[in-house]
Regions:
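OB-fold ssDNA-binding interfaces and closely related basic DNA-contact patches used
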Residues: 1-119, 172, 176, 180-184, ...
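Compact mixed alphabeta submodule
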Residues: 93-204
Length: 208
């Protein structure tokens, strides 16, 4: 279908989900849907931008390093180590966003869930209140403190229910690449290291 000139965006529109941005001090989110277990490597891309490459040695379903699939990042960069990178979706500011979890924060949420129940349940779940606190001068000197006394069961509102009516699984939001696709991407990054930035490479890391 053709559209009017003043309606065009001039380029293909991407249907992707924003990521939640942690802020200093108080944070509040409502976790929804399923959780994605994964480990990632971080590689320098164009313009020095860090890009996440999923560790294919790690099995999402088993939550274990099974080494079933070929891990091309380990082959190309044996000095690199992968890091914990679990994620889930959340409702924040009237939108569904991807919440890239912090390990210590998730551990606190899991302890609280023993008493409060599943935080993702639409009817009996609860809002996650926590603080982000600087503990030193370096970027990594940060602590996440769950405010358990503020976390109370609350059913989702009608508007929130509408937001998650067609919620995707995290396996769709952050798709797992095949070993061949990952190798191709690594090769493209190598070849493009001395060339102009290739937007198609960066596009591979967009959240769907």
């Amino acid at each position: 279908m053709a559209i009017k000139f003043n309606q065009t965006k001039g380029e293909a529109q991407k249907n992707k989900i924003d990521s939640y941005q942690y802020v200093e001090g108080d944070n509040k989110v409502r976790m929804v849907g399923d959780m994605l277990p994964r480990y990632v490597y971080w590689l320098k891309g164009e313009n020095g931008k860090n890009l996440p490459f999923e560790c294919l040695s790690f099995d999402r379903d088993a939550e274990a390093f099974t080494n079933v699939e070929k891990d091309w990042v380990r082959e190309y960069h044996p000095e690199l180590k992968c890091g914990w990178s679990y994620a889930i979706q959340c409702i924040h500011d009237g939108k569904v966003k991807v919440l890239n979890l912090k390990k210590k924060l998730l551990e606190q949420i899991m302890v609280a869930a023993e008493d409060l129940g599943d935080p993702t349940d639409p009817e009996t779940g609860w809002d996650v209140y926590f603080k982000r606190v600087k503990t030193g001068p370096m970027a990594y000197n940060v602590e996440y403190q769950l405010q358990a006394l503020k976390c109370k069961p609350r059913a989702l509102t009608e508007d929130e229910q509408a937001l998650i009516a067609e919620l995707k699984s995290m396996d769709e939001v952050l798709t797992r690449p095949t070993p061949d696709a990952q190798k191709e991407l690594l090769d493209r990054l190598r070849e493009g290291a001395s060339n102009e930035p290739d937007e198609t490479v960066t596009d591979e890391f967009d959240i769907k």
